[in-house]
Swiss-Prot record:
Name recorded for this polypeptide: Queuine tRNA-ribosyltransferase accessory subunit 2
GO terms (BP aspect): tRNA-guanine transglycosylation
Keywords carried by this UniProt record: Cytoplasm, Metal-binding, tRNA processing, Zinc
Subunit structure: Heterodimer of a catalytic subunit and an accessory subunit.
Encoding gene per record: tgt-2
Length: 373
């Protein structure tokens, strides 16, 4: 089971605790994040490096993304010991399985009444309910996500929006048919695009079913690099959550920057993922929070591709105790990026994930010191 409890509600968000995830005891404080995986690994890190150099505050809850593993689905099924063991993950890890990659492409126009499209290195895969159920049961993760028709951009027509919500409902009903076995705790996907009415309708249609451990909100149109409107996000989330039980875990997936994370925490989101720090690392960027975060939501992003750092032999960021900042300099990192060395991405992922982890610790501390409701 996913055992989650809210410990405190404030105007700035809610403090919670996840005691267990699946069969794994995690004692994980929220707001926090799932550790984003690609091909069953933290991008650019071996498990040995992750264990020895990536020092995070809490027990990992890993987010296993399907697109980089779907081509191995039959092999994993034949292997018979689950996806986590197949990928060499740490023993006893808490793992959540999602059909989508928060950093992957999801072009529109490819979903239909029987399946949603996911994109792999080899192209499009149409993921239907039967295939998804088989993958869920053979992968053996602690929790799973239901399918959602995500193809609801801002300019989507009313007819297509209605179809998207109806499909999301149908996918869920088919997945949990009475005579079908589905392993893993259920995290229900909530869609509806930019329509407040359809956000609420989708929540009512799929979010009030039995045996639900939590919810994940489809919000890819509001991630880093896209124009966002705080008022619009607030209204959509209010319509989504108002008809649902307030004590359930609330998740969201995608590369959200610190300012947006802080805003989403205020709207009651409990669990994010670490795709944002990975995205920055793969662009050759590192980020650092302002000294007064989260009183201020400001943060700095530094582009180490810039040749101005070539002769700079100071640490990446003063005061950061991560492996990267204590062992390497700006100039060396710029050299690694310039020569396209694999070590560059490793070092940037370590720093960015450490800073992202620190961000949530600061947010939790702020909530602890805030007046409760």
């Amino acid at each position: 089971m996913v055992k989650f409890q809210i410990e405190k509600k404030t105007l700035l968000g809610r403090l919670g605790k996840i005691d267990t995830w699946g069969s794994v005891e995690v004692n994980h404080q929220t707001p926090s994040f799932q550790t984003y995986l690609r091909a069953g690994h933290i991008p650019h890190l071996t498990w040995e490096v992750a264990e020895n150099q990536l020092k995070l505050e809490q027990t990992h809850i890993f987010q296993m993304t399907l697109p980089t593993l779907v081509s191995n689905a039959k092999i994993i099924e034949k292997f018979g010991k689950g996806a986590a063991k197949f990928c060499g993950m740490p023993a006893g890890a808490a793992v959540h399985l999602t059909p989508f990659d928060p950093l992957g492409k999801l072009p529109g126009g490819y979903n239909d009444s029987k399946s949603v499209a996911i994109w792999t290195a080899n192209g499009k895969v149409s993921l239907d309910v039967k295939m998804w159920r088989e993958i869920i049961n053979s992968f053996g993760c602690g929790s799973i996500e239901t399918l959602v028709d995500y193809d609801t951009p801002k300019d989507v027509g009313q007819k297509k929006l209605v179809k998207a919500v109806d499909r999301t409902k149908t996918f869920q009903e088919q997945l949990f048919q009475q005579d079908e076995k589905v392993n893993g705790e259920r995290i229900v996907s909530l869609g509806g695009g930019f329509s407040k009415y359809h956000r609420r309708k989708c929540a009512v249609d799929v979010g009030l079913a039995e045996n639900i451990a939590g919810y994940t909100v489809e919000f890819r149109e509001f991630t880093e690099g896209k124009e966002t409107d705080d008022k619009e996000m607030k209204e959509l989330l209010e319509e989504t959550f108002s008809p649902l039980p307030p004590t359930k875990l609330r998740c969201i997936s995608g590369p959200f920057n610190p300012k947006t994370v802080l805003f989403l925490v205020q709207q009651g989101i409990d669990l994010f993922d670490s795709s944002f720090p990975v995205k920055l690392a793969e662009e050759g960027h590192a980020f650092c929070l302002s000294d007064d975060f989260p009183t201020s939501s400001k943060y700095e992003v530094v582009d180490f591709n810039n040749e101005k750092f070539a002769d700079d032999f100071t640490a990446l960021f003063d005061g950061c105790a991560c492996y990267t900042c204590t062992k390497y300099t700006k100039g060396y990192l710029q050299h690694l990026l310039n020569t396209r060395e694999l070590l560059a991405s490793i070092l940037l992922v370590i720093h960015n994930m450490t800073e992202y982890d620190k961000m949530f610790k600061l947010i939790r501390s702020s909530l602890e010191n805030s007046e409760g409701l």
